[in-house]
Amino acid sequence: MIRRPPRSTLDRSSAASDVYKRQHEALPSCKVEVLIPDFMGLVEPLATVLTAEPDVLNHNIESTRTIFRLVRPKGNYDQSLELMVNSKRLAPSIPTKSGIIVGMGEDISEVIETMRDLRAVDCDLLTIGQYLRPSQQHIRMDRFYTPAEFEFLRGEGVSMGFKHVASGPLVRSSYHADEQHRSATLQPR
């Protein structure tokens, strides 16, 4: 997984695209998943990244609509969904992936609604992990989800049509990325 520079450095999207292309050239068998910001809603930097033809395009929505501004004050929930729409419009064969972090104050029905929103924009792959407060400056953790709840969310995601759902307390964006990629490419589009 290659993480793209943050949203404050949008002018670097072509440089990042060059890195992805060089990675493909140097190691053609190595799969490249790119983790990108929302590009503040701009399509041009997304298009630039997609010209490198990454194997998976990942943009983490991170939270539910109800607490989105608390979690990502500079982001926009609908803008994140629109990024997925634009990705599929510009490069329909590139699998898309997103991630949700739980335990920040949402309830499980809101997580399911976020999953539905992601499927509605044809997101292929999903990760769901437990929020762990990294410092006192970050939002408080509301609660730990149980293993049964993570399994329930995984099952819901599979029934919604996600090609792969990784759901568990330690799951993060890069969690078994190779398995997720295989799941996305083995199934007919």
Regions found by a protein language model. Name each.
Residues R3-R4, T64-T66, R133-S135:
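A short, flexible beta-alpha/helix-coil linker loop
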Residues P37-M40, G105:
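Short, surface-exposed acidic/glycine-rich loop or hinge patches that mediate macromolecular interfaces
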Residues R22-S29, T51-A52, G75-P95, I100-R189:
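Auxiliary Fe-S-binding modules of radical SAM enzymes
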Residues M1-A16, Y20:
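Single conserved hydrophobic/aromatic residue that forms the stacking wall/gate
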Residues E33-P37, T66-D78, L90-A91:
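Internal alpha/beta domain cores that form substrate/cofactor-binding pockets in large enzymes
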Residues A26, C30, V43-N58, E62-R69, ...:
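Alpha/beta enzyme core
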Residues L42-V43, I108:
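Structural motif corresponding to alpha-helix initiation and N-cap regions
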Residues P37, I61-T64, Q130-Y131, L170:
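Short, ordered loop/turn segments at secondary-structure junctions
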